[in-house]
Amino acid sequence: MGGIGVISGKGTRGGGHVSLGGATSQPSKARFEMHASTSAPTPPGTVNPFVSTTEDRLSTFAIDVDTASYTLTRRHLLEGALPDREVVRVEELVNYFRYTYPEPTDGGPFAVHMDAAPSPFTPGRHLLRVGLQGRRLSITERKPAHLTFLVDVSGSMQSPDRLPLAKRALRMLVDNLRDGDTVALVTYAGDVRRVLGPTGMESKALIHAAIEDLTAAGSTAMSSGIELAYQEAMKTLDGTSVSRVIILSDGDANVGATSHEEILKRIRGRVKEGITVTTVGFGLGNYKDERMEQLANQGNGNHYYVDSLVAARRVFQEQLGGTLEVIAKDVKLQVEFDPAQVARYRLVGYENRNIADRDFRDDKVDAGELGSGHTVTALYELELKPGAGEGLATVRVRAKKPRGEKATESVHPFRATSLAESFQDARQDLRFATAVMGAAELLRRSPHADRWSLDTVRDIARASTPKGNAEREEFLALLEKARPLLRAVAAR
């Protein structure tokens, strides 16, 4: 079986099954700038190309733990329709699933893991998996959370899968908070309303009643709602607790100062003050997925899509610690491929998380946040040169403490000797992640997947799904939903 590197985010080098620490030399900044890529906004639907290592040996991106794309894709398939290409973000489908990465053992905020195997899709190519596992904080370790719920109660939120579901999700979240946490509630439609100021958990009944009284009507003044939510959040901002605005909406905004760039600018400014944003999307039809994702990205938070109570339970109960508690911020990954070993590479997904190579060590450049217990997985397609030897790739991770301003860097080499001899010899989690990646590439009609087969994806997923694993079994069922839809597209 191919090896998987296990390295704590606190250390600098590692391989095999150990957690190591120590210093290491770093290449000069000029070297990184020489291979710099663009950091301009990536248009929706863009697919990362293959890159020659002689032109750019460095791949740099911000982590992403959002999962909204999987839930939204699932909703489309269950309703008998293919999602739009731009809705399918490969990294969010892959990161939706749980993988058994060992946790850090030396007190660091995360551990880094790597493994690789031949590609089951394209002969002569390999797949490299890079994973991060965040440290899990206990309930007692979690900081007090001061949450401001910003709820869209406009007319577009009337259907059962929107405001009624959002209310049930909020009640579930409140029931999983603890002493020391507070909740404020702001709504927006044609105007904005402060429903409840910061309220402690000793008054849960009052919070539940305020949520239950919410009704939908009118137009959508999102911009004004965000401003009032921040005013409420400032009341409990103390520099030591979690301060987060949670926006629940279908993303529509049609009244008020709703310039999208203006809203994003306000959110970026509030992040510097210590208030982050999580977005939770509801509904289908006119749902503005891209808008909700951008709000969360600029707010240093997460983007979720909730289509059922099961999905709400996952976000607000099972993964509440990760939803609320950041253990590392501005987390960047940079993978350096050895041109003597690797001819070309392609990062699958993360198109809207790309960072210029020269900005990897610029601590002023924003990146992604890692929550308690969160995992991050990235997959690369590689074309190796004949007789690839030792130094296949080096993974560098930079991250700041939750309230820090200076990042630390860890370095993790991956050697060609750690490659699995065959895809069947690869670890079960790598095989399943490959199946999810393959399905996502097919669903977004990636040009790199022209010769890939949904049958191959299904066979891989089936062989890497343990009996009783409900999440993976659901994925298998979704593949069957996708089959006739993809065939219909191919026949046109």
Where are these regions (language model features)?
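Intrinsic-disorder/low-complexity signature in envelope-associated proteins
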Residues: 1-39, 45
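Exposed boundary/loop context
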Residues: 2-8, 14, 38, 211, ...
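An acidic, Ser/Thr-enriched
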Residues: 28-76, 81-87, 104-112, 120-128, ...
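Extracytoplasmic
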Residues: 84-99
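Exposed acidic/Ser/Thr-rich ligand/metal-binding surfaces
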Residues: 111-331, 385-389, 402-404, 476-488, ...
